[in-house]
């Protein structure tokens, strides 16, 4: 294994191959975090003492319509410029500056590993998706190969960061002036997509934070405790699998509960997997959606609704917010092995019980009760869905009109 990791409850091997010995392309690693101090500390640790490593750091200045580009290596700051953008957004930053700058750094010849440090609170998936397309043969970045996608998180604050309802704008790390994403939404997306999660803080004293990391990171990924354990050579010795990364981040690929033996002393984290072949009743779902999807939980998965049986619907909740929508049809969905996926409801809920001495919050019990209540009963389904014909579609504001839904 390229990573020396903390003992992990995940027994599965790292599915991504090491680069071929004769692969001379420049390694490209992508770093995401919600904390500017963690980002800068990680970048410093990666370039110090590694003269062949260079880091490209971006910060979006939405109010100015610009981004700040900083390039550093072991010798210090190589570049520090403010670059105007057509639109001050993440996709424009990648298209207008990251891609040409990465190509220039790869062509320079001084470095064989580039670390792209994303703007604080940026999600790695859309950036890596764009970079994967650009690193194919004949594309603009074909001199680079995707190495490691990593997320850096602090286990001491992770329970608060993930489960509370603070917004990124309230914390001062929003990508735009009106960024209404929850901190927990961003953090969860970073952890769920990463090949490697690097933690700071004490994983023993903050066992719940460490437990939440393990419940969210994908099967086959790694966790390393401490920035001191992070080495650029380890990152370069890995090859990111874009397909596996997309699958981890997809609502169909949500990680299920950990083995019971994996719990460490002091770990109050928990996972509840809500699964049924039956669809949700739309009216009851709307009535109890807050009980099922809001509060101090991270919930993610797929569901189907009795009055639109062909629609594959996504469920994504964190930081007190919940988003539902359609992903297409069940006929288009396949497993990682390419097999068809039958319509089903599967939502994985992750949370933490209150510390000892504090009153219980009853979240797990509330979620389980709401799930049982909103499922359509066998008697309701016996007529093939006729009972829902002609009724007002109460979920249309979120899922679209049934005539337009796929």
Task: Give short role names for the model-derived ranges.
Residues 22-24, 294-295, 307-308, 339-344:
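A structural signal for short secondary-structure junctions
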Residues 334-406:
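Generic C-terminus detector
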Residues 2-4, 9, 51, 61-65, ...:
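C-terminal accessory "lid"/substrate-recognition subdomains
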Residues 39-41, 205-209, 280-284, 355-369:
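Short, conserved charged micro-motifs
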Residues 3-4, 26-148, 157-160, 168-174:
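Nucleotide-state-sensitive switch-loop elements of NTP-binding domains
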Residues 116, 197-198, 270-275, 345-352:
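Short cationic amphipathic helices and targeting signals
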Residues 4-24, 357-359:
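Intrinsically disordered, low-complexity terminal tails and inter-domain linkers enriched
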Residues 22-28, 267-268:
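A short, charged/proline- and glycine-enriched loop
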């Amino acid at each position: 294994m390229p990573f020396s990791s903390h003992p992990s409850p995940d027994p599965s091997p790292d599915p991504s191959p090491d680069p071929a010995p004769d692969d001379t392309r420049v390694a490209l690693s992508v770093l995401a975090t919600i904390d500017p101090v963690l980002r800068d500390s990680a970048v410093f640790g990666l370039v110090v003492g590694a003269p062949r490593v260079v880091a490209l750091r971006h910060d979006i200045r939405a109010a100015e319509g610009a981004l700040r580009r900083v390039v550093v290596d072991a010798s210090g700051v190589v570049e520090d410029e403010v670059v105007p953008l057509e639109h001050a957004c993440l996709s424009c930053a990648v298209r207008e500056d990251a891609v040409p700058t990465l190509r220039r750094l790869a062509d320079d010849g001084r470095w064989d590993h580039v670390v792209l440090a994303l703007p604080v609170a940026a999600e790695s998936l859309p950036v890596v998706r764009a970079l994967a397309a650009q690193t194919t043969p004949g594309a603009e970045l074909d001199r680079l190969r995707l190495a490691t996608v990593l997320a850096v998180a602090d286990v001491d604050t992770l329970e608060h960061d993930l489960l509370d309802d603070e917004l990124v704008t309230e914390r001062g790390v929003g990508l735009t002036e009106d960024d209404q994403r929850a901190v927990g939404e961003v953090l969860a997306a970073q952890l769920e997509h990463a090949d490697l999660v690097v933690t700071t803080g004490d994983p023993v004293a903050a066992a719940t934070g460490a437990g939440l990391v393990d419940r969210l990171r994908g099967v086959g990924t790694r966790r390393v405790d401490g920035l001191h354990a992070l080495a650029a050579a380890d990152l370069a010795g890995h090859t990111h699998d874009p397909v596996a990364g997309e699958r981890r981040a997809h609502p169909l690929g949500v990680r299920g509960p950990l083995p019971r033996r994996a719990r460490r002393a002091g770990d109050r984290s928990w996972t509840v997997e809500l699964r049924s072949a039956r669809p949700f009743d739309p009216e009851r779902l709307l009535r109890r959606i807050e009980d099922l999807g809001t509060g101090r939980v991270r919930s993610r998965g797929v569901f189907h609704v009795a009055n639109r049986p062909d629609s594959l619907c996504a469920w994504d909740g964190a930081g007190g917010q919940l988003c539902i929508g359609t992903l297409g049809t069940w006929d288009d969905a396949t497993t990682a092995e390419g097999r068809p996926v039958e319509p089903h409801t599967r939502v994985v809920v992750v949370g933490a019980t209150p510390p000892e001495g504090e009153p219980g919050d009853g979240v797990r019990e509330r979620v389980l009760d709401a799930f049982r209540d909103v499922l359509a009963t066998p008697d309701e389904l016996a007529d093939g869905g006729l009972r829902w014909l002609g009724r007002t579609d109460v979920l249309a504001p979120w899922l679209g009109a049934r005539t337009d839904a796929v």
